[in-house]
Amino acid sequence: GAAAQQVNFEQFVETINVGAFVQEQIGYNDFLFVTLGARFDAHSAFGSNFNGQFYPKVSVSYIPSDSGNWSGLGPISSLQLRTAYGMAGLQPGAFDAFTSYLALASANGAGIAPNNLGDPDLKPEVSKEFEIGFNAGLFNNKFNLEFTYWDRITTDALYARQFPLSGGFRNQQLTNVG
């Protein structure tokens, strides 16, 4: 005769994400601009030993061609100088910080098996970036030239590492490196 295996499954998933963002741009006579901003993130994906992350940013833009005493520099009819510094983050997956198990059903009975080995110290990957550049309008603004130099440094990079399968955990563990 034919036999059928019945499988029942129920799952309840809850994640909590809290963030706050503020930004202000201050201008002076339409040729000097300063932008200040900040973001704070807290997420249930962060490990239990980590509370939240603060990401500041600042940028300055100076437009000498709009300052009132600009007569041009040869073929350069307009010029904007700019610089910025900021931080940004990449959060881990919702359950990467937690150790989890799988429910198993077999002909021999029910059981559990290791699934994910969590990391209570897990936190977001953070990138710090600095940039400097300019925009120039050439030949009565018929041509535009833009240049940007930037440098990014990433710390606490999220890295998936595999443990020996003999330990029972089949999934890779996400951890911070660097």
Regions from the language model: what does each represent?
Residues G1-G178:
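Extracellular/periplasmic, surface-exposed regions of secreted and cell-surface proteins
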